[in-house]
């Protein structure tokens, strides 16, 4: 069971330090509301059975991630007249199973505002912009629209401008749907070593936003924590815990009604393994612009994906001669190239994604899963399966240091 009360109290002090840095403490009552939200989060995590399965360290990182996101929302909500893209940072602890193959950047906006986005397109495989009716990760908000910047003909290396909101413009203009509160930019990479990121900036073109009462950002941060606790700990986690263990359901379109990316198909499953077992996943290499698989811990959080090979794209993985990708999930290294390392978690989640498909996946393209004894794994794999030595495994991990998050200027 995680006892993170001292940690949570220290987070309250962090918020107070921020308040002093930006021009004085919060108004009376705002601090109490935030303190209550942080301590309520601590109590919720400590009482949740998931804390036992995840362990104290993972639970602490999860709490850190939620509060760090609240701090980002606090800061952004102070600057609605001068918005900016906030890049999600860190390599673990972020709620909602962040995809290691994506760079996520968020900006807070209003549906009545007019904005200009400037950027220079990188060479990564996909670039989308979603309009959401809630702050990202505050809840499973609705995905109001998806803007595919690649469909606008923006090529790698090209500088571009995009106008949002207000009256219709002649070129590269998109409306902001009623209820829009945030933009989520998503850059998807299939080759971490070779592909480059897109640079993005945003400015507000219309009148300045109304001056906020000084308590609003604080209450917004408190609302974030309270909504996150309801969304993940009380809502989403109990739902996905009902998924069958070690079995894959058919691919489905992502639910844009809960903030998912439109045009994506996905498979989510639970795994549970003993130390002498492996889960063998077999899937056909598709013609999707992006195809990837990743693991999540019991909190539905991506483990440290730099020091552990918790994810692979179809470009990173070895494709067998029959056109299939075979991934092995096991607590110990089985010596195959396509090992997915659960980072010590004996139970957790598997998530597979296909983006940019020319057509929906056919029934025979659905992935399969087989639970096997580690001693029998070799017999279940093709004779030509790529094996790796410890030095080669170390080299794989060394190459993962070229994560997109470290390649931004």
Segments and roles (model prediction):
Residues 13-23:
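Bacterial N-terminal signal peptides
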Residues 28-409:
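A compositional/structural signature for long, glycine/proline-rich flexible linkers
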Residues 1-9:
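N-terminal secretory signal peptides that target proteins for export/translocation
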Residues 4, 25-27:
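Intrinsically disordered, low-complexity regions enriched in polar/acidic and amide residues
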């Amino acid at each position: 069971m995680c006892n993170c009360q001292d940690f949570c109290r220290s987070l309250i002090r962090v918020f107070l330090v921020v308040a002093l840095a930006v021009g004085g403490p919060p108004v009376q009552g705002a601090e109490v509301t935030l303190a209550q939200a942080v301590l309520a989060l601590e109590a919720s995590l400590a009482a949740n059975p998931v804390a036992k399965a995840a362990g104290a360290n993972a639970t602490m990182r999860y709490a850190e991630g939620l509060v760090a996101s609240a701090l980002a929302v606090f800061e952004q909500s102070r600057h609605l007249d001068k918005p900016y893209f906030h890049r999600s940072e860190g390599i673990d602890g972020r709620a909602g199973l962040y995809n290691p193959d994506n760079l996520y950047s968020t900006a807070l906006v209003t549906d009545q505002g007019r904005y200009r986005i400037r950027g220079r397109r990188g060479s990564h495989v996909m670039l989308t912009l979603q309009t959401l009716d809630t702050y990202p990760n505050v809840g499973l908000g609705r995905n109001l629209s998806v803007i595919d910047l690649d469909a606008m003909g923006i090529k790698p290396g090209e500088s571009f401008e995009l106008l949002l909101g207000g009256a219709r413009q002649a070129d590269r203009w998109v409306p902001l749907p009623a209820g829009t509160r945030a933009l989520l930019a998503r850059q998807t990479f299939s080759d971490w070593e070779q592909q480059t990121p897109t640079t993005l900036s945003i400015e507000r073109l219309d009148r300045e936003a109304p001056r906020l009462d000084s308590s609003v950002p604080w209450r917004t941060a408190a609302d974030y924590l309270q909504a996150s606790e309801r969304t993940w700990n009380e809502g989403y986690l109990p739902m996905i815990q009902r998924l069958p263990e070690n079995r894959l359901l058919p691919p489905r379109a992502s639910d844009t009604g809960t903030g998912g990316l439109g045009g994506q198909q996905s498979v989510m499953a639970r795994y549970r393994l003993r130390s002498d077992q492996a889960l063998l996943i077999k899937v056909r290499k598709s013609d999707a612009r992006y195809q990837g698989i990743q693991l999540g811990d019991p909190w539905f959080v991506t483990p440290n994906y730099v020091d552990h090979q918790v994810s692979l794209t179809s470009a990173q993985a070895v494709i067998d001669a029959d056109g299939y990708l075979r991934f092995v999930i096991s607590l110990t290294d089985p010596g195959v190239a396509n090992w997915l390392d659960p980072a010590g978690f004996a139970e957790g989640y598997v998530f597979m994604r296909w983006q940019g498909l020319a057509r929906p996946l056919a029934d025979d393209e659905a992935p399969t899963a087989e639970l096997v004894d580690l001693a029998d794994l070799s017999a279940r794999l093709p004779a030509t399966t790529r094996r790796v030595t410890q030095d080669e495994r170390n080299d794989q991990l060394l190459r993962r240091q070229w994560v997109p998050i470290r390649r931004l200027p």
